[in-house]
């Protein structure tokens, strides 16, 4: 028996979606509604054989979901709203409360809204998306899938910041980590491809894209991750600085009379690859500029790789070794240069890349005699979300759900 599951990612002015047939994991359609709240909202829906695009007014998220469901019916992707058996919602922050994906109830939704203080740009709109789908599809169970939940297995030394204790105890300031859905999916696929239980592996997963994070996974548990209290921290990213000396901020604020909001804009939107290269936040553009001799672009690429290498080194120490290094995300999956730079001169760890395999994006790119496996695995957060819907909302199907 097959089930139609929707995976939803609601943004402040957008709604990204995918409809999957489960447990096969086949994508039936995917799309995006952008510029919600505007008279010229952009609607894109794609199947394997067709693509529809139009510009229409979309007043709010309720209008967006209503429009999406109307289009699925109109394009005969579904015959009835009852064809949708469940809906999975990506939620940015689960705090310490949610340690796994969960079936949405009124109480669950209220808790997601209360956690908005930890993710003010994301949780409110994630909750709004859940609320609208529950209204319009009352017979389809909704499941909340949290970016932070996979990292709730971190031990205290990995998540506590060396600040006065009350900042954690009273305000919840700690490392939470993000990209958990991606790290969980990719590590599961790796274990399946190796034919080894994830519980027997020490894995470092590099999710590299405009937002990047590194995750150490030991015996199937996240034991450390580079993003912290917010997705701004950790390694260098497209427009985000990652970790810097915190005293730089008050120094800049005093010298340039910047407000906290302006400092946040600087760290989140003007730094990283864009800030150092002066070219672009897109790794491909920076790579192209570096190839033409642009010194700052070359430096940006070097910094990007070195911050990742330093993080990998510390995680190998923490886990007492490494069995597999995995690359995923837009850069991790597509840039041979980035992978090569991260793995450069690591033969002393038993880690070496075969450049011919690397250039053709093979699944395993380590040399024949390397002790550490190096893998390139496409992430699929939507499939992971759909699998969690099956596991939690349709438990009779649990045995059918395996990573694709």
Curated annotation (Swiss-Prot):
It comes from Salmonella typhimurium (strain LT2 / SGSC1412 / ATCC 700720). GO terms for cellular component: cytoplasm. GO terms for molecular function: acetate kinase activity; ATP binding; propionate kinase activity. Disruption phenotype: Decreased propionate kinase activity, cells grow to lower density on 1,2-PD and excrete more propionate into the medium. A double pduW-pduX deletion grows as well as wild-type on 1,2-PD. It catalyses: propanoate + ATP = propanoyl phosphate + ADP. Its EC number is 2.7.2.15. This is Propionate kinase PduW. GO terms for biological process: acetate metabolic process; propanediol catabolic process; propionate catabolic process. NCBIfam families: ackA, PRK12397.1.
């Amino acid at each position: 028996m097959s089930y139609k599951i929707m995976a939803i990612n609601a943004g402040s002015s957008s709604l990204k979606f995918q409809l999957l047939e489960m447990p096969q994991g086949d994508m039936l359609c995917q799309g995006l509604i952008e510029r919600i709240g505007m008279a010229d909202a952009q609607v894109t829906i794609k199947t394997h054989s067709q693509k529809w695009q139009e510009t229409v007014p979309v007043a709010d998220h309720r209008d967006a979901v209503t429009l999406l469901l109307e289009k699925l019916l109109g394009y005969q992707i579904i015959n009835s709203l009852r064809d949708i058996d469940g809906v999975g919602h990506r939620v940015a922050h689960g705090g310490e409360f949610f340690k796994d994906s969960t079936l949405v109830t009124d109480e669950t939704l209220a808790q997601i809204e209360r956690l908005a203080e930890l993710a003010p740009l994301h949780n409110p709109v994630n909750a709004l998306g859940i609320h609208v789908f529950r209204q319009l599809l009352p017979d389809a169970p909704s499941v909340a899938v949290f970016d932070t939940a996979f990292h709730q297995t971190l031990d205290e030394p990995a998540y506590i910041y060396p600040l006065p204790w009350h900042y954690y105890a009273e305000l919840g300031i700690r490392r939470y980590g993000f990209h958990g859905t991606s790290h969980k999916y990719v590590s599961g696929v790796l274990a399946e491809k190796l034919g080894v239980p994830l519980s027997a592996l020490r894995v470092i997963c590099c999710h590299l894209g405009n937002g990047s994070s590194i995750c150490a996974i030991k015996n199937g548990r996240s034991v450390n991750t580079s993003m912290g209290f917010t997705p701004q921290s950790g390694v260098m990213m497209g427009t985000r600085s990652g970790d810097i000396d915190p005293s730089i901020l008050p120094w800049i604020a005093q010298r340039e009379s910047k407000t906290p909001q302006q400092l946040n804009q600087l760290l989140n939107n003007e730094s990283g690859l864009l800030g150092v290269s002066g070219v672009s936040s897109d790794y491909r553009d920076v790579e192209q500029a570096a190839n033409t001799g642009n010194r700052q672009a070359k430096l940006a690429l070097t910094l990007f790789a070195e911050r990742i290498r330093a993080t990998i080194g510390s995680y190998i120490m923490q886990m007492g070794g490494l069995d597999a290094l995995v690359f995923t995300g837009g850069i991790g999956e597509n840039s041979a240069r980035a992978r090569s730079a991260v793995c450069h001169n690591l033969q002393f760890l038993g880690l070496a890349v075969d450049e011919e395999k690397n250039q053709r994006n093979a699944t395993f790119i380590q040399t024949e005699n390397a002790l550490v496996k190096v893998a390139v695995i496409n992430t699929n957060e939507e499939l992971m979300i759909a699998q969690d819907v099956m596991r939690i909302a349709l438990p009779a199907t649990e045995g059918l759900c395996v990573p694709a």
